[in-house]
Swiss-Prot record:
UniProt-recorded Gene Ontology molecular function terms: rRNA binding; structural constituent of ribosome
Annotated family: Belongs to the universal ribosomal protein uS19 family.
Annotated protein name in UniProt: Small ribosomal subunit protein uS19
GO biological process, one term: ribosomal small subunit assembly
Coiled-coil features, chain-numbered ranges: none
The protein's role, per its UniProt record: Protein S19 forms a complex with S13 that binds strongly to the 16S ribosomal RNA.
Encoding gene per record: rps19
Lineage: Archaea, Thermoproteota, Thermoprotei, Thermoproteales, Thermoproteaceae
Any one cellular-component term (Gene Ontology): cytosolic small ribosomal subunit
Pfam families on file: Ribosomal_S19
Keywords: Ribonucleoprotein, Ribosomal protein, RNA-binding, rRNA-binding
Organism: Pyrobaculum neutrophilum (strain DSM 2338 / JCM 9278 / NBRC 100436 / V24Sta) (Thermoproteus neutrophilus)
Length: 158
């Protein structure tokens, strides 16, 4: 299989597979000078002060009911995971801000068609869930060549 065919195959599989950093390497993580353990121990109002303005403003207004429901699901999943049971967390809340207590979980985020599994690592903190489950896919053009444009589609046949 040529390299171009391999690239096209990767595009079909989903190109947004993020590089997953193993939990053993999470010790090097710092968010605004704080380690993950420090972030987990911070009260919510102190954590909010560390976020960028858009996320800070959103959380200061309070959580929406669907976000509260998602946090309850996450806490329940963590309790069940401690007992050895595996729970799938599915959500439509693409505008939920990733909090430190979500780290280490896989949350299935709806992209309009299917649920995309998103493994939450410390580097996702402060971002929105929807950023990691794209709603559109990369355009894969057909003949007469890779990355064909409209003008080059109408090439005269020999």
């Amino acid at each position: 299989m040529s390299s171009k065919e391999q690239e096209a195959q990767k595009g079909k599989q989903g190109w947004i597979t993020p590089a997953v950093i193993p939990p053993e390497e999470w010790g090097t993580f710092r968010y605004r000078g704080k380690t993950l353990e420090e972030l987990l121990n911070l009260p919510m109002d102190e954590f909010i002060k560390l976020l960028p303005a858009r996320q800070r403003r959103s959380l200061k207004r309070g959580l929406k009911p669907e976000h509260r429901k998602l946090l309850e699901k996450i806490r329940k999943a963590k309790r069940l995971a401690a007992q050895g049971k595996k729970v799938t967390i599915k959500t439509h809340s693409r505008d939920m801000i990733i909090l430190p207590e979500m780290v280490g979980l896989t949350i299935h985020v709806y992209n309009g068609i299917t649920y995309i599994p998103v493994f939450i690592s410390p580097w996702h903190i402060g971002h929105y869930l929807g950023e990691f489950a794209l709603t559109t896919k990369v355009v894969q053009h057909g003949e007469p060549g890779l990355k064909a444009t409209r003008s080059s589609l109408h090439i005269a046949a020999k």
